[in-house]
A protein has these predicted regions:
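A conserved acidic, glycine/proline-rich C-terminal tail/linker
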Residues: 74-80
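Glycine/charge-rich catalytic "coupling/switch" loops of P-loop NTPases
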Residues: 2-60, 80-105
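OB-fold (S1/OB) nucleic-acid-binding surfaces
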Residues: 1-4, 63-74
Length: 105
């Protein structure tokens, strides 16, 4: 599983980032867009494939929990009426600017 994060040069320097270094990547669930598997993710965003494990329907958006093919659990949101169902294939996308990095020891 790979992802991209957009950070400033100053942040990279302060963190002391090095190639191959272990990092923790975080984002809020509100930054995760869930979409039907057949849709194409926008260019310039991180995206992963998985399967819906839980779906909480709402009046404007549905909360979608998914098990990614890489084994990671993620939660995001889809517009109401997206057609997603529990056990359906899904794509999740996160903009590079929404990913926060932390050092992992």
């Amino acid at each position: 599983m790979s992802l991209a994060s957009r950070i400033t040069a100053e942040s990279a320097e302060l963190l002391g980032l090095q190639p191959g270094q272990a990092l923790l990547a975080l984002c809020k669930a509100t930054a995760v867009r869930a979409m039907p598997y057949a849709e194409s993710p926008a260019a310039g965003v991180n995206w992963w494939e998985g399967r819906v494990t839980r779906l909480s329907r709402g009046p404007e958006v549905d909360e979608v929990a998914a098990q990614l093919d890489a084994g990671v659990q993620m939660v995001g949101f889809a517009p109401t009426g997206s057609g997603l169902r529990v056990r359906s294939r899904v794509k999740l996308q996160v903009d590079e600017s929404a990913v926060v990095l932390a050092l992992w020891d």
